């Protein structure tokens, strides 16, 4: 059940520069997400969907504008504080799974907790982290695959592992950037159903970037970006937290090739 405003952004601008060429991507974006909400961000290629997610998730900084999380401004934090925020409050899922090939699925899930711990802390609490990782692997339906290497897993199983890894730190806010973009249609539906369950049962707030309107229509609300602007304005009204079906969401392309292709994991 969606609640009070959890994160909001005001007048966000982002420009990518390469040599003498400047490419404005976001041009004054305002948006909000409520606590417990499952929000979709859709738009055409180059509209700024992934850029917006990177800014909200403190993976990048805006050129102008402000971002607030739990009523505290976060876009102007130091690099160390942003790292801490990503590793303790946020979880990230991307189109590509970014699993370390030499580690088992279970070991991949444990990585964020290893990174946030000191050596001595890990020696004392590693078994607790392992138990939580096992619980999450079972939660995403991979209890029987946790000791397999990534190369032994299907695409859907690798994405489920990535979701478990994103949840290991018990994040309050989960960012999902095209989580079904590398999967077949049926597997993609399964992944989105898993995200819905996490939202509804565990009350995880989710911001999802997707080009798939069928998927987007199954979330609480939809924001459409057009040429760096929000075309469908956001209104945080209690009655708006059902499925939204805007009439203007037509003829979107199949994929987005964003100027910034970097896919960094929080704290990794």
For each feature predicted by the language model, list its residue ranges.
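Extreme N-terminus of proteins, especially the signal/transit-peptide cleavage junction
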Residues: 1-5
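Conserved beta-strand-loop-alpha-helix hinge in the C-terminal portion
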Residues: 229-260
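Non-catalytic connector elements of ABC transporters
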Residues: 258-268
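ABC family nucleotide-binding domain
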Residues: 6-225
